[in-house]
């Protein structure tokens, strides 16, 4: 999951920026989820704290942004731990990552670099020359980084983050208020990063977690580019929305039903674009376990694409 945990350091109570995984009582926890064109926004109100997280992939980029704004709506100063959590696979082959544990756990390692948790697959190959492989293998790098606030603590081991007999709804790393600053070697990897936000009454602060699979040097540059977090994220979302609204503007219908108009003009068209781009792969994040890319399905999606984007080659 793309989990963000919020912990009140005064009361030691904690919750998540989406209702799950913590799952607070809905009589006290209020939440909304909005799906837009290429982004999702989740808003939550609990214990005098309002949070809004926007998940998206910037236009023409290959990493995720989890843009979080937190507002103190109470009448007293609040100290909050904010923890972002991403669970990495060990083997990029989804099936092998599940069943071939004696191999998939053997090849994984996590370390902390500057403001991010770096996961390396086949880390022992990091000394070979760029572009070269051994047994068709090279180092694979994944990361979760933090922009807009300093890192207070981190964890790269799923078992250590969750704790024995704990689940994603009550991880020890969040309950304790401090991650253990330990990486992982030959176990199950994760990337967890905690920062502490001090908020005066009425104050809002904005941060971003960045997640991707890219070499370490480039990952560092990506995180550094979000120093002015709010301005960068707002601009990226404006570009993303403008692009998709432009794509969807070429073919529009107008009927007496607003719901039908929305379905045809936005969601049917957007879904056809997505399934065309991904070609009906089994998931948006991997292409294993099913039957890969479907030529027939892609041709079916073209029935709308050639109307909505007539200049597409």
What would you call each of these model-derived segments?
Residues 301:
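RNA-binding accessory domains that recognize and position tRNA/RNA substrates
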Residues 304-305:
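Cationic, amphipathic, low-complexity alpha-helical segments enriched
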Residues 1-298, 308, 312:
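Anionic coordination/interaction segments
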């Amino acid at each position: 999951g793309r989990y963000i945990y919020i912990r009140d350091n005064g009361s030691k109570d904690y919750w998540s920026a989406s209702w799950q995984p913590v799952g607070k009582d809905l009589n006290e926890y209020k939440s909304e989820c909005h799906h837009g064109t290429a982004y999702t926004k989740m808003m939550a109100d609990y214990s005098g704290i309002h949070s809004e997280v926007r998940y998206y992939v910037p236009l023409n980029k290959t990493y995720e942004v989890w843009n979080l704004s937190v507002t103190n709506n109470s009448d007293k100063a609040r100290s909050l731990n904010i923890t972002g959590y991403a669970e990495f696979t060990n083997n990029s082959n989804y099936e092998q990552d599940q069943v071939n544990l004696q191999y998939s756990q053997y090849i994984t390692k996590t370390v902390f670099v500057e403001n991010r948790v770096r996961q390396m697959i086949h880390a022992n190959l990091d000394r070979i020359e760029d572009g070269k492989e051994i047994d068709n293998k090279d180092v694979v790098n994944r990361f979760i980084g933090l922009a807009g606030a300093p890192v207070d603590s981190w964890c790269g081991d799923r078992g250590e983050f969750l704790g024995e007999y704990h689940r994603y709804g009550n991880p020890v790393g969040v309950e304790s208020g401090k991650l253990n600053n330990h990486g992982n070697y030959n176990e199950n990897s994760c990337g967890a990063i905690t920062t502490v936000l001090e908020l005066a009454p009425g104050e809002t602060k904005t941060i971003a977690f960045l997640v991707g699979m890219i070499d370490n040097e480039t990952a560092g540059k990506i995180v550094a580019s979000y120093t002015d977090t709010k301005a960068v994220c707002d601009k990226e979302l404006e570009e993303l929305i403008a692009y998709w609204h432009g794509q969807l503007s070429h073919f529009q219908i107008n009927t007496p039903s607003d719901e039908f108009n929305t379905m045809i003009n936005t969601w049917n068209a957007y879904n056809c674009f997505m399934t065309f781009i991904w070609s009906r792969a089994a998931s948006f994040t991997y292409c294993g376990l099913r039957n890969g890319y479907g030529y027939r399905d892609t041709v079916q999606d073209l029935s709308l694409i050639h109307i909505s984007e007539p200049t597409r080659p």
